[in-house]
């Protein structure tokens, strides 16, 4: 059996840029799944379910692929927050986060469409926000417009100035694709990124 083609089941330019760091050829597709949370679903269960669903949805387009699915949410004050989608929501999310700790949960799934084998795990990452003035929040939102980023920031850009501390095993997790975990999963499928 030949090595399956690597597929990223995501249209996120941020996830694509992260995956390019590994130097492996890949294609991407839009998994186009229903991302509605189930009543009383925990953040970890939600991202695990959606990462698996995205990876499995990619098999429609690439039936012999090795498909990566990923999903991320942030939790603040025990509530799941997602992408703000507009300026007002972004300001509200960052105002709520000011001076607090937010945990991001990123679900990562690797689905071998040839064998039906799936490996799915959740990688946490914790962000400690500085105490931010309303003017700082507005200025940041206007400069980076993080409307499609969970938690309303881009940590790979100016968003780093919002934080006092980061905690986690892989900073790539915060951007949306835990590469350390992914390389471990790929190795279990016979793909060594260092070979």
Curated annotation (Swiss-Prot):
**Which keywords label this protein?**
Cytoplasm, Hydrolase, Nucleotide metabolism
Q: Which HAMAP family match?
A: Maf
| Alphabetized InterPro entries for the sequence | ITPase-like_fam, Maf-like
Name of the featured protein:
7-methyl-GTP pyrophosphatase
Reactions performed catalytically: N(7)-methyl-GTP + H2O = N(7)-methyl-GMP + diphosphate + H(+)
| Site residues (Important for substrate specificity), renumbered to this chain | 14, 72, 156
Q: Which organism is it from?
A: Shewanella oneidensis (strain ATCC 700550 / JCM 31522 / CIP 106686 / LMG 19005 / NCIMB 14063 / MR-1)
- The superkingdom of the source organism is Bacteria
Which family is annotated?
Belongs to the Maf family. YceF subfamily.
One GO molecular function term of this record is: nucleoside triphosphate diphosphatase activity
UniProt xrefs under NCBIfam families: maf (TIGR00172)
Q: Which CDD domains does its entry note?
A: Maf
Q: Name one GO cellular component term.
A: cytoplasm
- Which compartment or compartments is the protein found in? Cytoplasm
Active-site annotation: 71
Physiological role: Nucleoside triphosphate pyrophosphatase that hydrolyzes 7-methyl-GTP (m(7)GTP). May have a dual role in cell division arrest and in preventing the incorporation of modified nucleotides into cellular nucleic acids.
Q: Where are its TM segments located?
A: none
Q: Which cofactor does it need?
A: a divalent metal cation
Q: Which GO terms describe its biological process?
A: nucleotide metabolic process
């Amino acid at each position: 059996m030949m090595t399956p083609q690597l597929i990223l089941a995501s249209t996120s330019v941020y996830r694509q840029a992260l995956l390019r760091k590994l130097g492996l050829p890949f294609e991407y597709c839009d998994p186009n799944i229903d991302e509605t949370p189930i009543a009383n679903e925990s953040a970890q269960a939600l991202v695990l379910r959606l990462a698996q669903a995205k990876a499995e949805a990619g098999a429609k387009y690439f039936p012999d692929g090795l498909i990566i699915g990923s999903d991320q949410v942030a939790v603040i004050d025990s509530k799941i927050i997602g992408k703000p989608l507009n300026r007002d929501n972004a300001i509200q999310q960052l105002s709520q986060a000011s001076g607090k700790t937010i945990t991001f949960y990123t679900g990562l799934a690797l689905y071998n469409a040839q064998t039906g084998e799936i490996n799915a795990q959740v990688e946490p990452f914790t962000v400690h926000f500085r105490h931010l003035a309303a003017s700082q929040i507005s200025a940041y939102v206007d400069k980076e417009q993080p409307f499609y980023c969970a938690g309303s920031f881009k940590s790979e850009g100016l968003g780093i100035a919002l934080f006092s501390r980061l905690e986690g095993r892989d900073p790539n997790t915060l951007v949306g694709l835990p590469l350390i975990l992914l390389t471990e999963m790929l190795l279990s499928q016979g793909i060594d990124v260092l070979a």
